Regions:
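Short amphipathic alpha-helical interface segments
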Residues: 55-67
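Short alpha-helical segments that sit at the start of domains
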Residues: 44-58
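Beta-hairpin "wing" of winged helix-turn-helix
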Residues: 99-106, 111
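Non-DNA-binding regulatory cores of transcription-related proteins
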Residues: 113-185
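A short alpha-helical element within helix-turn-helix/winged-helix DNA-binding domains
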Residues: 71-80
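Short, Lys/Arg-enriched N-terminal segments with co-localized hydrophobic residues
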Residues: 21-46
Length: 185
C-alpha cells in the first residue's frame, strides 16, 4: 500500500462494500509494503512466494529431465519433493501461458515448449507472482500513481530497486541454472 514513515500521516483510501473513503491515517512505523515484504507467521520476510520458487523448480526439472519427451508430474513431484497436489495447481498456469505443453495417456505428462535458454527467471516469476513492483504506487510499465510522486523522496529508491531486480532476474535463464553440475536438481 504505502511506505510508512514514522511520525507522518498519509491520505489513505479504504475500499469496501460501501465504496471508497479517504481518511488521514497516522503512520507509526517504517516498513516497505510490496511483494517482497510478505510476513510469515514466524516473523521472517519472504522475497519470492512458494508459487514462484516452485514454478522455477518445475520448469528446471523439465529442462533437465525432459528434452523432447513428456514427463509425468508425479516424477517431478518426487524429484523436487513438492506435493503433487501443489504442482497440479501450478501446471495449468504454466500451460495456459505457453511455458509447457501436455499429453495424456501412456507416455504423457508435460514438457517445455521452448529451449531452456529461452526462459528467464523474470518471466517465470512474473507469471507466478503477478505484479513484481515493490510498492503499490509503482507499476510494471514504469508509470506512477501517487499524488505524492512529485515530491516523494523514496520513489527513486523503489524505481531503482525494481529496475535492478528486473534486470537481474531477466539475465538468468533455465539453461544458466542447468550449468552448475555440483548442485542436484
Amino acid at each position: 500500500m504505502y511506505l510508512a514513515l514514522g511520525g507522518y500521516t498519509a491520505l489513505c483510501q479504504l475500499v469496501g462494500g460501501s465504496g471508497r473513503k479517504d481518511i488521514s491515517c497516522p503512520i507509526p512505523l517504517i516498513y516497505p509494503v510490496g511483494w517482497w515484504y510478505n510476513k510469515k507467521k514466524t516473523g521472517e520476510g519472504s522475497m519470492i512466494s512458494t508459487k514462484g520458487r516452485y514454478s522455477i523448480r518445475i520448469l528446471l526439472d523439465l529442462a533437465a529431465n525432459g528434452g523432447e519427451k513428456y514427463i509425468p508430474m508425479k516424477e517431478v513431484a518426487a524429484r523436487q519433493e513438492i506435493s503433487l497436489k501443489y504442482i497440479e495447481k501450478l501446471t495449468p498456469v504454466l500451460k495456459s501461458a505457453g511455458f509447457v505443453e501436455s499429453a495424456h495417456g501412456i507416455g504423457g505428462g508435460y514438457r517445455l515448449t521452448r529451449k531452456p535458454e529461452a526462459y528467464t527467471l523474470w518471466e517465470i516469476l512474473q507469471l507466478a507472482e503477478g505484479d513484481l513492483t515493490p510498492v503499490s504506487c509503482l507499476h510494471e510499465d514504469g508509470s506512477v500513481t501517487c499524488c505524492r510522486a512529485p515530491h516523494c523522496r523514496t520513489l527513486p529508491v523503489w524505481q531503482r530497486f525494481y529496475t535492478m531486480t528486473r534486470e537481474y532476474f531477466s539475465g538468468i535463464t533455465l539453461a544458466d541454472l542447468l550449468q552448475d553440475p555440483e548442485k542436484p536438481l
